[in-house]
Amino acid sequence: MTQPQMAPICLVENHNEQLSVNQEAIEILDKISQPVVVVAIVGLYRTGKSYLMNCLAGQNHGFPLGSTVQSQTKGIWMWCMPHPTKPEHTLVLLDTEGLGDVEKGDPKNDLWIFALSVLLSSTFIYNSMITINHQALEQLQYVTELTELIRAKSSPNPAGIKNSTEFVSFFPDFVWTVRDFMLELKLNGEDITSDDYLENALKLIPGDKPRMQASNSCRECIRLFFPNRKCFVFDRPTHDKELLQKLDSITEDQLDPKFQEVTKAFVSYIFTYAKIKTLKEGIKVTGNRLGILVTTYVNAINSGAVPCLDDAVTTLAQRENSVAVQKAADHYSEQMAQRLRLPTETLQELLDVHAACEKEAMAVFMEHSFKDENQQFLKKLVELIGENKELFLSKNEEASNKYCQEELDRLSKDFMENISTFFVPCGHKLYMDKREKIEHDYWQVPRKGVKASEVFQSFLQSQAFIESSILQADTALTAGEKAIAEERAQKVAAEKEQELLRQKQKEQQEYMEAQEKSHKENLEQLRRKLEQEREQDIKDHDMMLKKLMKDQKAFLEEGFKKKAEEMNKEIQQLRDVIKDKKRNTDRIKEALLNGFSTVLFHYLVRYLKHL
């Protein structure tokens, strides 16, 4: 992103508790091809969320700050700008309307705002006031609803792995900001960090009371869904009530020094550690991809469905892969047009350029495509490249045929115009001398191309009757000499035909060898792509397993043995899935490659018919 967005714009509008996507905001995202770092903030209304986002934007003004008890932000607002510390990246700030606004009727509306913020962000900030206690955790009840609001897969996992277990592979990092914090950071008389404070607050507390179980449920969900957690505790910005009403217009030196210190640390942390938004299997999200995700999720919500990551990625893949196919096909056509000088001297010259351009086009597709089930889009690219290759072959033949015919017409012009002069005694020898001179001069012409022999052979065939007529009219020759000359002419014609046939067979062999080499290179690129996807898939499942085992150990240490034991079955199921993926990957990969080979063979047969 070269220029920052001048001001925030509403991304997801919330009118009468109905969510809709602002197309103007989508158009902004659609122009951003860079990877995006997406930072979203949620929290109760009137807790200063917008102020923190303006700090990240480096502006006093931007996201509106309210000075009354009414919530200022409605829906989800977006501000895009070049990332201040990561070149070639775009920072996307998402400010959300306050949760728990008494003026809103349906609490489900808050849940969707919360869920969308989680789905869209790479760093998720929860902003609250005063302290992290039972009340604060109860106010964060939305996190316990995520299993009902978000699905990782479009169908139940056949291995029995919970939907929520897969959240860790695509959920954002979690940052809890506590405002107007008045307590000392101490635990059992020892100084602790704000991170220690958060982790201690998230420990499960024994007890069967409903309120205790509710706050424990929230603690457990935060721990299970968000493995990477951070906490910042802020003093009051100022103790001057009047200044609090106009934070967007006061100078930095009017703010409390401790508040300034933590604010700077918070901004530095976000700029340094907030990651690129990624989906499962390591798919990096760009601005235009983010726009597709927003639209897909909001459409799902409005249709009464639950936003599903797999469905969103499939939608994304369909569009992105179509674009990748066109981008790769265009690259092939453009490079072929630039590098080829038609007509080429030989077929091999064209095939060499084709091979280089096809390899580059395949690399372009591999770079920009993902989740290409059954190589559907790769096969489409192979077909398009094949069609374009056939077009270049035809153009090359046409250019060669045209050039050869023009040169032959030029060289034989006087010869053809004065053909009658050969119907004289000794005319046959004069005719042959002149024709051989034309042939010699013709083969001296450079870069005639692949049709050179065929064009000259056609010329010779057109001269067969004329030569025979001149021969028969030559009174200087005996009947025997005429017969010998006739036989020699037929023999030369037959040899020329055989030579032309051998050339075509040679070109056919060159074509097949080039196609086989190209086939192997394409398969190798596909193999590398599948291998990368396999490694990323195993890596994602390994991360899930390590996270489950870490959580299980923590529950045991906190005395929740039963809860830890309940995790054994899922841990074993996850181990089995990983083992199966490692064991069966080669077989699955080869099946895919064999299917792709069949398609390539089909196109090979089709192109050979061209020769």
UniProtKB/Swiss-Prot annotation:
What induces or represses expression of this protein, per its UniProt record?
By IFNG/IFN-gamma, IFNB1/IFN-beta, LPS and CpG oligodeoxynucleotides. Up-regulated upon infection by T.gondii or L.monocytogenes.
Q: Where is the GB1/RHD3-type G domain?
A: 33-275
| Keyword DNA-binding appears in the UniProt entry | no
The reactions it catalyses are: GTP + H2O = GDP + phosphate + H(+)
The biological processes this protein is annotated with in GO are: adhesion of symbiont to host; cellular response to interferon-beta; cellular response to lipopolysaccharide; cellular response to type II interferon; defense response to Gram-positive bacterium; defense response to protozoan; response to bacterium
E.C. numbers: 3.6.5.-
The main location is cytoplasm
Its subcellular locations are: Cytoplasmic vesicle
Q: Name one GO cellular component term.
A: symbiont-containing vacuole membrane
One example of the protein's molecular function in GO is: GTP binding
SUPFAM superfamilies annotated for this entry? Interferon-induced guanylate-binding protein 1 (GBP1), C-terminal domain, P-loop containing nucleoside triphosphate hydrolases
Note the InterPro entries from the entry. G_GB1_RHD3_dom (IPR030386), GBP_C (IPR037684), Guanylate-bd/ATL_C (IPR003191), Guanylate-bd_C_sf (IPR036543), Guanylate-bd_N (IPR015894), P-loop_NTPase (IPR027417)
Record's keyword annotation contains Nucleotide-binding: yes
The entry's keywords: Antimicrobial, Cytoplasmic vesicle, GTP-binding, Hydrolase, Immunity, Innate immunity, Nucleotide-binding
Q: What does the protein in this record do?
A: Interferon (IFN)-inducible GTPase that plays important roles in innate immunity against a diverse range of bacterial, viral and protozoan pathogens, such as bacterial pathogens Listeria monocytogenes and Mycobacterium bovis BCG as well as the protozoan pathogen Toxoplasma gondii. Confers protection to several pathogens, including the bacterial pathogens Listeria monocytogenes and Mycobacterium bovis BCG as well as the protozoan pathogen Toxoplasma gondii.
The family line of this record is:
Belongs to the TRAFAC class dynamin-like GTPase superfamily. GB1/RHD3 GTPase family. GB1 subfamily.
- Name of the featured protein: Guanylate-binding protein 6
Q: Where is the organism placed in the taxonomic lineage, from the top?
A: Eukaryota, Metazoa, Chordata, Craniata, Vertebrata
Gene behind this protein: Gbp6
